[in-house]
């Protein structure tokens, strides 16, 4: 985290704009599209690669989630490497010794659609996005629209916490 802040502060100037694309890795064309959009609008883009344990209700799903950090970094290098910073924290970096999710009142949105079948999933999503926003401190953050419910959850979390991040 300290290295991330040191690097970003060296790059910072009055016209500096930091974009952020949070991912769980296993990057694909959709992720690259988000990173490209972020590169077009920001001085520097941080791409996080973090498999978040608090959004999995099934430990088998967590353990079987693909982790391809080397391949993901190579894929990002096909874009504009000098303007992309990969942040791949450990669970301890983000949560300390005990990964737990915060509870958010998403106004019932968390119980609709996918939320009906994945208890606590969106508290985990809200928690990790909030923590990553606090660590990275971006001006702009980019999320795919494919997962409409998750996008709405993130927007609601930003509204609740009043974090100064444009989605």
Predicted regions and their residues:
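Nucleotidyltransferase catalytic core that binds NTPs
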Residues: 1-167
